[in-house]
């Protein structure tokens, strides 16, 4: 199946016959003192997706495997059809929620073998997704971050300018200023003040430079000088009394589903955490994607005192490997913050029950949970989340059972997490550096 032949089809999906939307369930009568922004991630468009009798030909992203139960909004062995992505953005547009901006943390192309893509195709996919967002939200400032699949070959994002960096810099000009465009072209990262919130700066990092499979950065102590740039930018924000939200694709810390596996190379992880700790008074939140799951982390200092709240958002794509039992329902989320100091107050997670949507032929995006209500916490501050995770660690914790259900975006209510699984989850949430993480594993495994 040729990927290139399907892009116009995606872009020309009739806007007039968009999917049906459910009524948003988030509280509508908010005080005007609360600001809001959306977070979407891991769209992973598969333009080849189509319903056909031959289940091996439904989508390129199944890599020849039989799609399990394909419908108009996708299949768990396939990346997102355009109709699924459009339904997510249509829901956001028609949700009735007022938002100041949106963050979009990368990965637009599908999971397909390297020979099935090219630099040109990757740029076309990112263009498609960017145009979709700009057409639906012409007046909303959007802050993108590049993902490891937003390049060809995948994962190999370079430390110098490239066709992809130049292309996205041009595509994202409506949202970014000249200085941001300049650093984006050079290294795939940038910082930008939020137009509607002048005291808030978004720092969009290219953490793909630190990703294990990226051979372009092997043995480089500061790829693209991003560490030096980050420290200078945070120091400037400190002096200018700005607050900062960090966004990126690949998160810091350890993967919660694997033993002793940092999401990025250990040296880079320790270096980033050191910078984040030193500027924790400036950083008001960190937001990532990449894992396709809903998880959180709390960055603490060397003495275990909580400093920063870290959120990893679930994907829009529902794709999983043939041998994987669990996957995620598609999800998007809304954060609430306090204007002025940009303290994070709450998070509202929405999702699409993919099985139900395919059966009914319409997308009923609905509320999954409101974080403070689900866990009975006051806000999203590091101390509040740290106390919550201490509850997760207790034996037979109902709070953790709830967390693990939401981890898969309510995909499978029968999913269980044994003691080993729980230890990996809790250690990853509370311990982002190698020393504290290893100590946690030794203590509990």
Curated annotation (Swiss-Prot):
Monomer. Homodimer; homodimerizes following 2',3'-cGAMP-binding. Zn(2+) 1 binds at residues 42, 44, 107, 292. It catalyses: 2',3'-cGAMP + H2O = 5'-pGpA(2'-5') + H(+); 5'-pGpA(2'-5') + H2O = 5'-GpA(2'-5') + phosphate; a ribonucleoside 5'-triphosphate + H2O = a ribonucleoside 5'-diphosphate + phosphate + H(+); ATP + H2O = ADP + phosphate + H(+). N-glycosylated. Belongs to the acid sphingomyelinase family. This is Cyclic GMP-AMP phosphodiesterase SMPDL3A. ATP binds at residues 111, 148-149, 257. Its cofactor is Zn(2+). Keywords: Disulfide bond, Glycoprotein, Hydrolase, Metal-binding, Secreted, Signal, Zinc. Detected in blood serum (at protein level). One of its GO terms (cellular component) is extracellular space. It comes from Mus musculus (Mouse). Binds 2 Zn(2+) per subunit. InterPro entries: ASM-like_Pdiesterase_prd (IPR017064), ASM_C (IPR045473), ASMase/PPN1_MPP (IPR041805), Calcineurin-like_PHP_ApaH (IPR004843), Metallo-depent_PP-like (IPR029052). Glycans are attached at residues 66, 128, 219, 235, 353, 364. Cyclic-nucleotide phosphodiesterase that acts as a negative regulator of innate immunity by mediating degradation of 2',3'-cGAMP, thereby inhibiting the cGAS-STING signaling. Specifically linearizes 2',3'-cGAMP into 2'5'-bond pGpA and further hydrolyzes pGpA to produce GpA. Also has in vitro nucleotide phosphodiesterase activity with nucleoside triphosphates, such as ATP. Has in vitro activity with p-nitrophenyl-TMP. Has lower activity with nucleoside diphosphates, and no activity with nucleoside monophosphates. Has in vitro activity with CDP-choline, giving rise to CMP and phosphocholine. GO terms for molecular function: ATP hydrolysis activity; phosphoric diester hydrolase activity; zinc ion binding. Its EC number is 3.1.4.-, 3.6.1.15. Residues 1-22 form the signal peptide. It is found in: Secreted.
